[in-house]
């Protein structure tokens, strides 16, 4: 079992939606754009941007988000911790990332700026489990508890 995104349908994996993540611009607090709460991708054409590797679970969503924009983005990274670390280390660099609790530990050094073009539910997260094997009662109860919790948090 895992909480993860999806790379598409897989007959061996059961994907139960749990929550979604918003796409944000991760900005070093020393950068002038840290004064903004929201920004358009069109305003970033002359900025140094980084984001996730397009071969990972965010590739389709990220490609769709920026498809109509003339942006220079280095698609090299696999997680929010690395993206935030790069932005902290270089105030001129910004990252397009999913809003995640992992970014909270960088709060003193970064600002998360909403991206106008990004849907609120940019990236769907799932509780993933085996679709082929029978689960123990404990695992089934855990799945039920998680899905119940997730459904209530979405209300």
Sequence positions of predicted segments:
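Active-site-adjacent beta-strand anchor residues
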Residues: 26, 51-52, 77-78, 95
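Short beta-strand-to-loop elements that line the ligand-binding cleft
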Residues: 5, 71-83
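Secondary-structure junction motif
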Residues: 47-69, 99, 103, 135-143, ...
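Extended ligand-binding regions for polar small-molecule ligands
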Residues: 42, 126-155
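Beta->alpha turn/N-cap motifs
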Residues: 1-8, 28-29, 80, 96-101
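Beta-alpha-beta core module
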Residues: 11-22, 36, 82-132
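Flexible hinge/capping segments at coil-to-helix
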Residues: 11-23, 27-49
């Amino acid at each position: 079992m895992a909480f993860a995104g999806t790379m598409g349908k897989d007959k061996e994996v059961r994907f139960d939606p749990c929550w979604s993540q918003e796409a944000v611009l991760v900005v070093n607090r020393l950068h002038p754009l840290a004064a903004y709460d929201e920004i358009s991708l069109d305003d970033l054409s002359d900025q140094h941007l980084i984001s996730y590797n397009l071969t990972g679970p965010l590739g389709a969503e990220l490609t769709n988000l920026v498809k109509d924009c003339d942006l220079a983005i280095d698609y090299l990274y696999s997680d929010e911790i690395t993206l935030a670390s790069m932005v902290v280390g270089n105030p001129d660099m910004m990252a397009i990332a999913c809003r995640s609790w992992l970014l909270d530990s960088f709060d003193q050094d970064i600002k998360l700026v909403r991206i106008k073009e990004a849907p609120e539910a940019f990236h769907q997260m799932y509780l993933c489990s085996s679709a082929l094997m029978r689960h123990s009662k404990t695992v089934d109860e855990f799945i039920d508890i998680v899905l119940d919790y997730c459904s209530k948090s979405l209300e």
